[in-house]
Amino acid sequence: MTKLLVLGGRFAGLTAAYTAKRLLGDKVDVTLINNTPYAAFRPGMPHVSIGVFKAEDLEVDLATALPAKGIKFVLGTVNAIDAKKNKVEYSAPDGKKENITYDYLVVAFGAKLGVEHLNGWDDYGSSVCEPDFATALHEKLEKFEGGNIAIGSGVFYQGTLKPRGKYPENWASVADSACEGPIFEMSLMIPAYLKKRGIMDKTHITIFSPGEEILTDIAKESRGVVKSLFAQAGFDTVWNFKLKELKKGEIVSEDGKTIKADIAIVLPPYEANDAVKNSTPDLFDDGGFVVTDEHMRSVKYPNVYSCGDSNQITVPKLGFLAVMTSRIAMQDLANRLGVPTKVDTYTPEVVCIADNPLEGFAIAVNDTTFYGGDEKIAQPSATNHIKKELFTKYFMWTNGDMALDKYLASW
């Protein structure tokens, strides 16, 4: 039986594992390695930070969910990929190093949150990118009685996309931030939360970005609407702010600019996974992301696929693109293993919903201008809030097996 090894249990890894088993059945032995025993629904972590959910409400138990679909689960942290010997080294929970071989590999362990680039992070940093971060931020917000809050993104250590994969030039560009959707979402949620607690009038909010302005991956017109919303809310905005240090009461940029911040809510810097430095070098580009073709196959090692944030092709780093790339990769694999399957065309699009659950509305974004297209929708409505709620329930109900996602992309 063909051995498929999947590295990572987030959107990309789960979609790859479930799709491969669905398409190939007994033709493939699927094993998934993840560094936590659960898969967190990360689009719900901002909701955890304001007390709408607890983190454990949004976690899928992989040791139960995966075997139920005929997929083996291994708890471990990937240390290295040897693409020449078809072998992966990982560390088990007891620290022991193990090796596992494969016929085909899916690299879906995502990017790394490079908090070590930010001096003072452990003492003063807050985020919503991981369950423990979101829980800690909620505890901090519950104690907050007014002052200054800064919300923004760290630098994306992406490299220069060289060598570039075999796909159209406009599918991937160098970006200042890996994804500023959570920043926009928090800019909606935090004021609503502070109003609910009766302390919004005691609080000043600043939005910052490492780019020339926020959300440069969507249309200029949509960014203009967002900036108008910020102005109406009385927020300060600071662009070209490349965060370097967090201190008590303020944050500092690489060029010495400061922003007052009793609480700093940050999308940390993104960079390549730690395993990259120990792995076969020519699997990756100069930023540590896997170089592939449009079917997500490595251009150097055709039995290696890369999906989601670990792939050079996915810019910005979005769950929507993670699911799409994984589905395409496993459709391609099915054909290679003798099961005729239609392979979807990769059509990159910025798709997300910035939710405001405390006020019952959300802004849905569908935008292709980053890739040279002309779609530029940014629509606020109560219906979009309901869509976000349904998407959350859908993910949890299916244990992350989003087979219908491509038909529900407007969510």
What function would you assign to each model-found segment?
Residues 363-411:
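C-terminal auxiliary extensions adjacent to catalytic cores
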